[in-house]
Amino acid sequence: MIQELNKTSFKKLILFLLITIGGTLVYFTFTDMPSATASGSVLVDKIEQSDGWGVIAVDPYTFKVYVTNFKSTTVTVVDGTTNKPLSVIEVGKTPYGIGLNTDTKMLYVALEYNDTLAIINTTTGEIIKNIDLVDPYDIAVNSKTNKVYVTSDKTNLVSLVDGSTNEIISTFDVQKPCGIAVNEATNMVYVTSESTNKVHVIEGSKNNLVTTIDVGKSPRGVVANPYTNTVYVTNQLAGTVDVIDGSKNEVIDTISVGNTPRRIVVNPDTNIIYVSNQISNSLSVIDGATNEVIDSIPVEQPFELMINPKTNKIYTTYSGHSILSIVNDVERNQNTLDDSKTIIGMLGAGAIAAIIAFFVIQKKKLKPEQKF
C-alpha cells in the first residue's frame, strides 16, 4: 500500500514539475526578453544659453552637433560625446535653418531675415561663400549628390544649390513651403506646404516636380527613411503623423500623436520615429514596423528636432528659447515584434507536456492490478 502511494505521489510530482517548468519558461519569455515598448530613454542633459537656440544639424561621424542661435549671429558647435559646447562660428544675423553635407563637411545656414544662405567649411570654421536668397527658411542636403534644397515661404520657392559650385541652379514653385527632406536612396525630395495641406514631391535626378500628396491639416515636419522608402509628415493642427509610401506617393496610414506635432526624425537603423509635440511637452516614439506609438518621452517645449542615428541621441529646441535638451534613447530591439510567436510556442510546449503527463498517469490508473 505504501509502495502504491509512493508511486502515485511520484507521478503527481512529475506532473507538477512539468507544469512548473512550462510556466517558468513562459514567465521568463515575458519578463526577460527586451521590450520595444519599455521606456529606456533618459533626458541626459540641458544646455542653456541666452542667445536663443534655433535649428540643429548633426554629423554622425564626428559626433559634432551644430545649432543656430536665432537671436544672435552664431552657430554653436557641441561635442556630442560630452554634451559640452566646443566653439561658435560667426555666420551673420538671424541664423535659423541649417543643413550639413556629411561627406564634404560643408554647413549651410539660412540667415532668415538677412536674405542670405551662408556656406561654412566646418573643418576651418570659415564662411566660404554667401548666396543672396530671399527669406531662406528650411534646408535639406543630399550628401550623395552634393545638392542643397532651401525653402522660402515669402517667395513661394524651393531653391536648388549645387554644392560643387555653390550656385543656385534651379527653383521650384511651391505654395508656402515649410519643411523639407531628402531620401538619399531614391533621390526624391519632399516639401510640406502648411497653407495648402499638401506635400510636394520633387525628383532630384530630373529636377522636376512630379506630384503633390494631400495630407492632414497644417503639415510642417517631414522625414524619409531611406531603408524602407517611407515618408512621415507631421500635421500640426490635426495632432497626427501621415505615413506615405514613397514608391506610390500615397498616404497609407495616419498615426495620432501629441498636441501640436512640429518636427519629426527617424533612426533608419532601428526604424524608430520621433515626433516633437510642443504643447504636450513630449516626444512621441513610433515603431516604423507597426506604425504604432510605443512610448512618450517627457521633454519641455520640444519644437526643432534632430537625431544622431549612431548614438541614438535626440536633440530638441524651442526656437528662440534658451534650452537645448538632449535625450539618450535606448536602442530598441525590433525583433521583439516577432516574439509573440515564441511566447505562443512556449505556452504550447508547456501545455502539451502537462497534458501528456496527465494522460500517462490516467493510463496507469486504468490498468488492472497484476497479482503475483
Where in the sequence are the language-model features?
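Juxtamembrane/start-of-transmembrane alpha-helix segments at the extracytoplasmic/lumenal side
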Residues: 334-348
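Core hydrophobic alpha-helical transmembrane segments of single-pass membrane proteins
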Residues: 18-22, 347-356
